[in-house]
Amino acid sequence: MLVSQRVTGARARAPQLAGLLEAWYRHGRTTSSYSALSEPSRVRALVYGNHGDPAKVVQLKNLELTAVEGSDVHVRMLAAPINPSDINMIQGNYGLLPKLPAVGGNEGVGQVIAVGSSVSALKPGDWVIPANAGLGTWRTEAVFSEEALIGIPKDIPLQSAATLGVNPCTAYRMLVDFEQLQPGDSVIQNASNSGVGQAVIQIASALRLKTINVVRDRPDIKKLTDRLKDLGADYVLTEEELRMPETKTIFKDLPLPRLALNCVGGKSSTELLRHLAPGGTMVTYGGMAKQPVTASVSLLIFKDLKLRGFWLSQWKKNHSPDEFKELILTLCNLIRQGRLTAPSCSEVPLQGYQQALEASMKPFVSSKQILTM
């Protein structure tokens, strides 16, 4: 009900809001467009002028926007999550960094308010998500170029739409692209309670794959275990339990994993490698422990294990926009079927961004922070 009320309010206010980022963003027309066809209006945005601690460098500012023209699309943002990649980008520790000052946020969903005369694929009322990282979604509205956006169906839940473009896409590609897995095969992963981890569990279940899910021990471990099993997890283990000899009993009931998904690094990634089948692949897509991946010589030689990396932004560079759109539609179908849900989310109004940023950086917080506009 809260989401519904906010979205309704956003739509009611939308006609009063008009289009484009103020003059100091004019150098960024590759993703945003600017026009002086109407009187400027003010919108709110979370802006950082230098890299550092997000709690210190991110500020809520009023920015001037003007009307759309040509291939521009005026978007009213509805909701946008805070992801680890957003935090890393603000800190300056990411593979893609926008010019400063910049608006935070790589993911989110918005509704089209108006389009320029040469826009062909979008119309007012459509829901859209960013086509690439670095768009700056933590704002009430903006005007972007048509090519910077992808239209999505409006018949999926708002939280699912807001969290669609990064984590589920990463999960799907890793499950499909690195090993030719068949129904009944198994996958092992760490950081299983993360947004990607929860998507891996659900997509793997839809593909009839078994999952062994590793998490850090915590006071509410039973609650977390039950929640992951409700999503479709076959086994949930703490990192300590994975090291115990009793873990071998798991592999009496299912084949050794041919695919491991690593978001942690350090000792956790070494344990994943130990449990891989000969010839298996470990894909690293994050490094939460800030420690290097360590693979013993014996594992590489005698088990012929493969170490790979995955970054969704690089995948997009190597594939056409149509292929990304096809991926999005595949995931939307899973959402419609009830086989893929949004991660556990906590909605926070944009003005409460400091609380949301702090919560997103705390350990053992499984709820994703969603900024609502």
Curated annotation (Swiss-Prot):
Active site: 94 (proton donor)
Annotated transit peptide: 1-53
Claim: Lipid metabolism is one of the keywords in the record: yes
A biological process term (GO) from this entry: fatty acid biosynthetic process
GO molecular function: enoyl-[acyl-carrier-protein] reductase (NADPH) activity; nuclear receptor binding
EC number: 1.3.1.104
Keywords attached to this entry: Acetylation, Fatty acid biosynthesis, Fatty acid metabolism, Lipid biosynthesis, Lipid metabolism, Mitochondrion, NADP, Oxidoreductase, Transit peptide
InterPro entries the record matches: ADH-like_C (IPR013149), ADH-like_N (IPR013154), GroES-like_sf (IPR011032), Mito_Enoyl-ACP_Reductase (IPR051034), NAD(P)-bd_dom_sf (IPR036291), PKS_ER (IPR020843)
Tissue localization of expression: Expressed in Purkinje cells (at protein level).
GO cellular component annotations of the record: cytosol; membrane; mitochondrion; nucleus
Recorded phenotype for the gene knockout or disruption: Homozygous deficiency causes placental insufficiency and embryonic lethality between 9.5 and 11.5 dpc.
Modification sites for N6-acetyllysine: 61, 252, 267
Catalytic activity: a 2,3-saturated acyl-[ACP] + NADP(+) = a (2E)-enoyl-[ACP] + NADPH + H(+); (2E)-butenoyl-[ACP] + NADPH + H(+) = butanoyl-[ACP] + NADP(+); (2E)-hexenoyl-[ACP] + NADPH + H(+) = hexanoyl-[ACP] + NADP(+); (2E)-octenoyl-[ACP] + NADPH + H(+) = octanoyl-[ACP] + NADP(+)
Keyword flag tRNA processing: no
Chain residues that bind NADP(+): 167, 193-196, 216-218, 285-288, 310-312, 368
Residue(s) carrying N6-succinyllysine: 61, 252, 267, 316
Compartment list: Mitochondrion
UniProt cross-references to CDD domains, sorted A to Z: ETR (cd08290)
Pfam family, one: ADH_zinc_N
Top-level class of the enzyme under EC nomenclature: oxidoreductase
Family, similarity comment: Belongs to the zinc-containing alcohol dehydrogenase family. Quinone oxidoreductase subfamily.
Role description: Catalyzes the NADPH-dependent reduction of trans-2-enoyl thioesters in mitochondrial fatty acid synthesis (fatty acid synthesis type II). Fatty acid chain elongation in mitochondria uses acyl carrier protein (ACP) as an acyl group carrier, but the enzyme accepts both ACP and CoA thioesters as substrates in vitro. Displays a preference for medium-chain over short- and long-chain substrates. May provide the octanoyl chain used for lipoic acid biosynthesis, regulating protein lipoylation and mitochondrial respiratory activity particularly in Purkinje cells.
Subunit structure of this chain's protein: Homodimer.
Protein name per Swiss-Prot or TrEMBL: Enoyl-[acyl-carrier-protein] reductase, mitochondrial
Organism: Mus musculus
